[in-house]
């Protein structure tokens, strides 16, 4: 209930494991040929070498046991039950394309996969884990670990070189440089430059849809107002004459 609540509130999918059933280290890897998994819904799946997996290491064999398909659905082994006493919380970020392909390959349109394939804020994971832990402490009388595990491999967003003149060229809006800069800043972007009408714009982590200059033009047009775009009647075609 806690992991589902956090997902619905923050948009970050999470998963919980019965800590007493698994053995570290936890390994994230691609599936090997011939591997299988029984998911939480009781269905058996033949895994593809393209599937990204969450695994543990029983008897010291690193990554040898499959716990779930990353970002899609957990396995039956390691699930939390009424007898569970210790919980391992997973709050992670996975590649959109990889998750979408695995979900479709195995016909598992889970709530988690739907969110991952549409893009999840890659800076949200610590906050989601903290929120889940606090809820378990408050309502489940749990005791949080003092040493959470954190593997931070998030890449910084690539800045977009943006010319203010693109707003007029693409959207037909006569918008001054300061207004454009203010709008992009208001939606969370980091804006640098602008003296010669060119900006270096770094989108915020929660806007994975902002990747190209045209995406920024769309944001400016949306916030200035589509009703401000001038209406121009296309010229009528002229028939050729001899």
Where are each of the predicted segments found?
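RNA/tRNA-interacting regions in translation and RNA-turnover enzymes
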Residues: 2-242
């Amino acid at each position: 209930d806690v992991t589902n609540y956090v997902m619905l509130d923050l948009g970050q999918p999470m998963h919980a494991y019965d800590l007493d059933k698994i053995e570290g280290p936890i390994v994230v890897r691609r599936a090997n040929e011939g591997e299988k998994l029984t998911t939480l819904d009781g269905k058996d799946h033949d895994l593809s070498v393209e599937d990204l997996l969450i695994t543990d290491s029983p008897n010291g064999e690193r990554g040898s046991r499959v716990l779930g398909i990353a970002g899609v659905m957990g396995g039956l082994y390691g699930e939390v039950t009424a007898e569970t006493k210790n919980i391992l919380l997973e709050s992670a970020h996975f590649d959109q394309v990889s998750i979408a392909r695995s979900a479709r390959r195995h016909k598992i349109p889970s709530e988690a996969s739907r969110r991952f394939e549409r893009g999840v804020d890659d800076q949200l994971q610590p906050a989601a884990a903290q929120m889940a832990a606090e809820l378990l402490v408050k309502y489940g009388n749990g005791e949080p670990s003092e040493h959470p595990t954190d593997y931070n491999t998030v890449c910084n967003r690539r800045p977009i070189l943006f010319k203010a003149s693109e707003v007029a060229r693409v959207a037909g809006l006569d918008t001054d440089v300061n207004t454009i800069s203010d709008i992009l800043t208001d939606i969370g972007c980091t804006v640098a430059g602008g003296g010669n009408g060119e900006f270096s714009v770094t989108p915020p982590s929660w806007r994975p849809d902002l990747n190209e200059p045209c995406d920024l033009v769309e944001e400016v047009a949306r916030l200035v107002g589509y009703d401000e775009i001038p209406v121009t009647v296309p010229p009528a075609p002229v028939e050729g004459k001899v």
